[in-house]
């Protein structure tokens, strides 16, 4: 038996962050879409349980319970109880690490979908979402890879507004941007504007209208502190903003990945090719945003 699942990159079109609560958690409001680029997770029957990471960034991935795929398997087996057969889980890691793309959460979501298929096909979506939500703030949002609005600590999910097809270029300068460090810099540097969501407009029919709405009413509150910690993120944003194909340039999540929204696939392809030529030391991917893929 071999099962495979796609683990798409998550992109925050906006991320509004409030001040920390008494427990130190920050309330957020975010519109999350998913890309048609990402990692892959596969499951195979085995005599003993094992986990391995392959792919371009596989060597940077922990293979113990520091990895969300391993923790996802442990959590689901604990939820099911009783004896369960062993599996070999393989992660093909194509996304950069600590990149603001929800890669770990998306990998865990893919693993949970595969494990449910193999171990407990009758387990409800709600039960699987509860397991995913226990793995981290993005866990439930990244389980299905479908566009969502996230509130609270990221666990309050609602369907995203209807949007036209979005063509984008993802760029990462191949420097890590640890979430905890960025939030600490955010707390130290700014007076929070608050996590209130923007006015959600229906009937956005073109990418130009989407970009005008994003630019006029939304932001990523973690972008400035992330750039302060790692100026190379700012270099990415400046380069993208200067290119003619870019309608909007912004950072995703806590970085370091940034995205440029483009009018169409041809424009995104041209921008990606030019960035790759200018900065061969950066990770660059043309993609579509939406989901599920």
Curated annotation (Swiss-Prot):
GO biological process, alphabetically ordered: isopentenyl diphosphate biosynthetic process, methylerythritol 4-phosphate pathway; terpenoid biosynthetic process
Segments traversing the membrane: none
InterPro entries: GHMP_kinase_C_dom, GHMP_kinase_C_sf, GHMP_kinase_N_dom, IspE, Ribosomal_Su5_D2-typ_SF, Ribsml_uS5_D2-typ_fold_subgr
Annotated residues for binding of ATP: 96-106
Keywords: ATP-binding, Isoprene biosynthesis, Kinase, Nucleotide-binding, Transferase
Catalytic site positions: 10, 138
Single annotated GO MF: ATP binding
Pfam family membership, one: GHMP_kinases_N
Catalytic activity: 4-CDP-2-C-methyl-D-erythritol + ATP = 4-CDP-2-C-methyl-D-erythritol 2-phosphate + ADP + H(+)
Domain of life: Bacteria
Pathway: Isoprenoid biosynthesis; isopentenyl diphosphate biosynthesis via DXP pathway; isopentenyl diphosphate from 1-deoxy-D-xylulose 5-phosphate: step 3/6
Enzyme class: transferase
EC number(s) reported in the record: 2.7.1.148
Functional note: Catalyzes the phosphorylation of the position 2 hydroxy group of 4-diphosphocytidyl-2C-methyl-D-erythritol.
Family: Belongs to the GHMP kinase family. IspE subfamily.
Protein name listed in UniProt: 4-diphosphocytidyl-2-C-methyl-D-erythritol kinase
Gene that specifies this protein: ispE
């Amino acid at each position: 038996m071999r099962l495979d699942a796609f683990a798409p990159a998550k992109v925050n079109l906006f991320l509004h962050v409030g001040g920390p609560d008494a427990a130190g958690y920050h309330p957020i409001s975010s519109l999350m879409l998913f890309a048609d680029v990402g990692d892959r997770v596969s499951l195979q029957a085995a005599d003993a349980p094992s986990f391995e990471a392959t792919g371009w960034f596989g060597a940077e991935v922990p293979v113990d319970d520091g990895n969300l795929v391993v923790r996802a398997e442990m959590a689901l087996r604990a939820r099911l109880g009783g004896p369960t057969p062993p599996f070999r889980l393989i992660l093909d890691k194509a996304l950069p690490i600590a990149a603001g793309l929800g890669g770990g959460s998306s990998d865990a979501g893919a693993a949970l979908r595969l494990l449910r298929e193999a171990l407990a096909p009758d387990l409800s979506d709600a039960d699987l979402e509860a397991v995913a939500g226990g793995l981290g703030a993005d866990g439930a949002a990244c389980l299905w890879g479908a566009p969502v609005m996230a509130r609270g600590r990221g666990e309050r999910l609602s369907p995203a507004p209807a949007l036209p097809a979005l063509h984008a270029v993802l760029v990462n300068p191949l420097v890590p941007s640890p979430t905890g460090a960025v939030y600490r810099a955010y707390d130290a540097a700014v007076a929070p504007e608050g996590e209130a969501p923007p006015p959600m407009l229906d009937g956005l029919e073109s990418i130009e209208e989407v970009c005008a709405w994003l630019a006029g009413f939304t932001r990523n509150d973690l972008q400035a502190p992330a750039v302060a910690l790692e100026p190379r993120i700012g270099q990415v944003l400046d380069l993208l903003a200067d290119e003619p194909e870019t309608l909007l340039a912004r950072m995703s999540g806590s970085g370091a990945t940034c995205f440029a929204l483009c009018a169409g696939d041809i424009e995104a392809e041209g921008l990606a090719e030019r960035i790759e030529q200018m900065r061969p030391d950066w990770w660059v991917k043309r993609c579509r945003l939406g989901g599920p893929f």
